[in-house]
Amino acid sequence: MLNKRHKYLQIAFNRSMEEVQSMITLLPPSDRIIIEAGTPFIKRYGVVGISSIKSWWGQKNAGNTYIVADLKVMDRGATEVALVAQAGANAATCLGLAPVETIDEFIKDCAEAGIDSMIDMMNVEFPFEVLQKLKRIPNIVILHRGVDENVNNREKTLPLDQIRRIKGAYNNILISVAGGETTREVMRTFFNDSDIAVVWRSFYENPENTTNLAEDFLKLAK
């Protein structure tokens, strides 16, 4: 599982199976890289896609893999959690906008399946209040500025102010920040004490430049 003393780069993949395989082979080996099977990728390829990503990254990274299945669960996630865990995922996501009962069940299901629970707080105005309502705390909270928000609402900033508040109350929680795509934004993310920075657009738009992009972002994950 993840080390609280480390910073991580999470790369989300949403291209075709063949393209994702090619891009993963271009990644530099690193224990700081997390591979995400993005929601569109999972919808297209299902658990076969997840197990394939696990295999490709394992071959490239000497078996050292951490795979996130971006399920975005909103209701009754038990079956989905079990399926992705069996396929080799190390973590799965549930939306913070889901009912509290659903989030509680999701966290329990992940614990029983032996994988990390990640709660995605996209479009949640007060993430801390969601956490206060839960029976148990997730392993990871994702503070998320969505893709459409990035494109259509440039005034929407990354919710970095939430990081220290959450960490101040929950010592064992990890914070992931999604929605910052430039090296400057990723640097700010880590400066504000996030544990994980999620990127995808640069890799999606420039798959042939995967190696250089990963190396540049990894320099920030110190």
What are these model-predicted stretches?
Residues 1-78, 136, 211-216:
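Conserved N-terminal beta1-alpha1 strand-loop-helix module at the mouth
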Residues 2-9, 76-170:
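Conserved anion-binding
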Residues 7-13, 33-37, 67-71, 92-94, ...:
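Hydrophobic faces of well-ordered beta-strands that scaffold small-molecule active sites
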Residues 16-27, 75-83, 125-131, 182-187:
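Short, acidic/polar
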Residues 23-27, 53, 84, 110, ...:
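Generic structural signal for hydrophobic
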Residues 29-33, 56-64, 86-91, 111-116, ...:
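Glycine-enriched alpha-helix->loop->beta-strand junction motifs that scaffold or abut catalytic
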Residues 106, 110, 191, 200-222:
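C-terminal helical cap(s) of enzyme catalytic domains, especially alpha/beta-barrels
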Residues 139-203, 211:
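Active-site/ligand-binding-proximal alpha/beta "capping" segment
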